[in-house]
Design a protein with these regions (language model features):
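Bacterial N-terminal signal peptides
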Residues: 6-14
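A sequence-level/structural motif corresponding to short, flexible coil/turn segments enriched
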Residues: 19-436
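Positively charged n-region of N-terminal signal peptides that target proteins for export
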Residues: 1-4
Length: 436
């Protein structure tokens, strides 16, 4: 592992000044194949967990690389603690593994298994890397787990897109398990696709995804649900802006009960299709607090979000407008009101990097990235601005239906790969730690 220490000092950007930031560590992980990070979560002791998909360590019956879900733990100092791959089958390019840490330190990972024509999968590890239990959930068709969140009582929620239930071709699902892996309830919002789930401090559950825009073929809005811990729908909203909006970067809840979603907004003109990163914040009552977009001369997407204890917002994503290389990861720091961009930084080398997730623990910011280049990397201030897409929020009389999904133990188990923190080529996962 190589650790780099340097500071970026305040630079006037016309949006306020960038605060001084110190890079603590930057660590790559993987093997000779492709190791793509998709999410990160932090624990109370300052350790962090990065999840994604790797094909570096196993092959199929024909000797071809076989994709597996991975979870890697890094210590409070950024050093590698342990690494695991789930032995079940998964599919690269279908779904994004996600990770959450419960108050007792248990680690939950969701994703997709290729068994049973694709089911959502939920894995529980202890802080030492022992796989405690595993569940596959779904029906007769394809059901993708895309997000996971935990509650203070130890329960865990997964969300994603299900094709097994309802009259439409897909639905946004939310499934609740207890800490022992027992299925508590399962719900679906028909006609939508799921991307995100979060749990507020009062136990309220929020889920988000996309839904077709009425009367506009090919255009999509964000749909947001508030659900009680017992599985009842409290309210439903749709957010509309541009031609297509989505919460691909998932969502996070603030200490005040508000929720923040990140993703992308696409606006199509006669000559171009502009894609910008999108940040949308709602109150616990479903009112719009703000909507902002982060846009340069090319393409930006929001791929991860967390809300700090002071309710400031961190957004991670990918940019082709700013940074040191062809494509870099970025992180934004926003005021709770969205009125001011406190920081805008990029990270990367001379090749291609993507941002996958962001987490906070104490005074440390953790970023999950993927890189195609070996060190050195650059942490740079981005001369970026936020603008208002001026989207609209609508109240929807939604229906949340119970579904007959099945949760089963796939009994696949976990293995210890021989991943390295020395860059091995191709795509590698990376954890970047910055002092807040």
């Amino acid at each position: 592992m190589k650790t780099f220490f340097f500071a970026i000092f305040s630079i006037a950007l016309g949006i306020g000044s960038i605060q001084s930031q110190t890079l603590l560590t930057e660590t790559t992980w993987g093997g000779a194949g492709s190791d793509v990070a998709e999410g990160v979560a932090s624990a109370a002791d300052g350790s962090s967990y990065v999840v994604g998909i790797t094909d570096s360590f196993t092959t199929d019956q024909f000797g071809n690389p076989s994709s597996k879900i991975f979870v890697v733990k890094f210590g409070p100092d950024g050093s590698l603690s342990w690494q695991r791959i789930w032995n079940g089958t998964t599919i690269r390019g279908l779904g994004r593994p996600d990770v959450a840490v419960s108050p007792d330190g248990s680690v939950y990972v969701t994703g997709i298994t290729a068994d049973n024509q694709n089911d959502a999968v939920l894995l529980k590890f202890d802080p030492n890397g022992t796989l405690l239990w595993e569940r596959a959930w779904g029906g007769a068709a394809s059901d993708e787990g895309l997000a996971v969140a935990t509650a203070s009582d130890g329960s865990v929620y997964i969300a994603g897109t299900a094709e097994s239930f309802g009259p439409s071709s897909s639905g946004l699902f939310v499934v609740k398990f207890d800490s022992a892996g027992n299925l508590i309830w399962q719900r679906i919002s028909d006609g939508a696709a799921g991307n995100a789930v979060a749990v507020a401090s009062d136990g309220s559950v929020y889920a988000a995804g996309t839904t077709p825009r009425p009367g506009q073929i090919g255009n999509f809005d964000i749909v947001v649900l508030k659900i009680t811990a017992a599985g009842s729908l409290v309210w439903q909203r749709t957010y509309s802006a541009g031609d297509v909006v989505d919460p691909r970067g998932r969502m996070a809840a603030g200490s005040d009960g508000s929720i923040v979603m990140v993703g992308a907004i696409q606006t199509v003109s006669r000559r171009t299709a502009d894609i910008a990163a999108l940040v949308v914040k709602l109150t616990s009552d479903g009112a719009l607090v703000f909507d902002k977009q982060f846009d340069g001369r090319a393409t930006e997407t929001g791929d991860g979000v967390t809300v700090a204890p002071d309710n400031t917002i961190y957004v991670a994503g990918t940019t082709t407008s700013f940074g040191a290389g062809n494509q870099d990861a970025f992180v934004l720091h926003l005021q709770p009101t969205g009125k001011k961009l406190l920081d805008a930084l990029t990270w990367g080398g001379t090749g291609f990097e993507t941002g996958a997730g962001v987490a906070v623990s104490g005074a440390t910011l953790m970023l999950a990235m993927t890189t195609t280049t070996a060190p050195p990397y650059s942490l740079l201030a981005a001369s970026a601005r936020l603008s208002a897409p001026r989207g609209t929020l609508a109240v929807v009389e939604g229906v949340l239906a119970d579904v007959p999904g099945v949760a089963a133990d796939p009994a696949a188990g976990a293995a210890i790969p021989d991943g390295s923190t020395t860059f091995s080529g191709s795509f590698e996962a990376a954890l970047v730690r910055i002092a807040r």
